[in-house]
Amino acid sequence: MKKGVRKEVLTPGSEALGERIQRIRDKKGITQHELATRVQTTQSAIARIERGEQNMSTEMIARVSSALNTPVITLGNDAINIQIEGRHKLKGEVTIKTSKNGAVALMAASLLNQGKTTLKNMPRIEEVFRLVEVLESIGVIVRWNDSAMEITPPDHIDITHINRASAVRTRSIALLFGPLIHYFKKFSLPHPGGCKLGSRTVKPHLFALERFGVSIVSKEEDYHISRHTLTPNEVVLYESGDTVTENAIMAAARIPGKTVIKFASANYQVQDLCFFLETLGVTIQGIGTTTLTIEGKPDINTDITYAVSEDPIEAMFFLSAAIVTRSAITIRRCPIDFLELELLKLEKMGFKYTILKRYKALNEKTNLVDIKTFPSTLSALEEKIESRPYPGLNIDNLPFFAVIATQAKGQTFIHDWVYEERAIYYKELDKLGAETILADPHRIYITGPTNLIANEVITPPALRP
């Protein structure tokens, strides 16, 4: 770091960091005034920090850590190292936030609308911030209004001024294939960055979009996209991926005529996208199935408001945390349609829970529930645990079962067939005292229950470790 330059920890991490500082301060019996005196700042500044309303420089983090006699976090060159104090029962309740995957898809889809799109309850996370920077760089007007995001496309998008630095830091840039073909006959996009887990290829997108008259050529640093007249068609997806399904849907949304998409993903973010497009007047049949029939609407110019639905992956995180700590907590606003198989497998392992309430999300489509967890004694399943495209066990939820398996009596067999290397990272659990056998880069055996111990572990280069 250059002398005189202070590196800052920005939102959304500031909120979590503030909560941690408050917990440590309360545990040590230190008042806000006392902490402020120790770090030579004002009590109001400490209050803002604990509410997540003030960014913290690395210097301030060091001063707070010293004043509390507890490291809050440590920063590496490219990563944040988090210290966690274990052996605590969880208590209380938590409300699930809206999904990152749904949010970025809706941001991209807002380019299909010439009017103003207001997306309610948008998650303030880095992936969203990076995509905002990309959209603003090409002329899109993006405004935050509390937790709502207002998006208004310009009359003319200037793709030549795209913020490459932000684009290469997010995988969500690939979601712009579908919308931008309605603006340009030729354009280029940088290769996406972000999550580096597993090998990724543009071929499924190429094969899907070429059915509409689009060509994608991958060069060293960019994708070169060109098209002729866009026409509706029958599209058989090369793989049932979420992003390729979303791109095919967004391509079809403004092409007049009927498009049929087969072997489509029916995952939560895809359904959220379909519900959003319906509010724009696009007719979609088969939502929630693997075959979608879309009647495109060539001209979309309307001011609409839509609420992003909740994140089943975050819900699974809190379910897992409750299970491994044997805690009784309440998890509110869980999108149950995308957790039912996970809950069934957990139930067969011995997990005890009850559903307190059923209701609709703000989009009036997604089914939500409140879940109450109870301390449970688990046994390993005889069958292997593997992920599948929806309605299978969610691919992003499989790693949670590796941690849960350390607390289940017997040997659990986990088959992570989607990613080439993710199962290797499960071996990090050995550092915590877990008993694992890596059969190959896709399969691992975990024997429990294990009394886990504290140690240093490394997370994979992924958004969903």
Where are the regions that the model predicts?
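Helix-turn-helix DNA-binding motif, specifically the short coil turn and the N-cap/start of the second
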Residues: 31, 42, 53
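Residue-level marker of regulatory loop/turn positions in helix-turn-helix DNA-binding domains and
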Residues: 10-14, 53, 310
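A short, Lys/Arg-rich alpha-helix, primarily the initiator
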Residues: 2-27
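Intrinsically disordered, low-complexity tails and linkers flanking structured cores
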Residues: 1-8, 112-118
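Short, structured segments at the rim of ligand-binding sites
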Residues: 23, 43-44, 48, 55-465
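Short basic helix-loop element that most often maps to the first helix and adjoining turn
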Residues: 19-38, 63
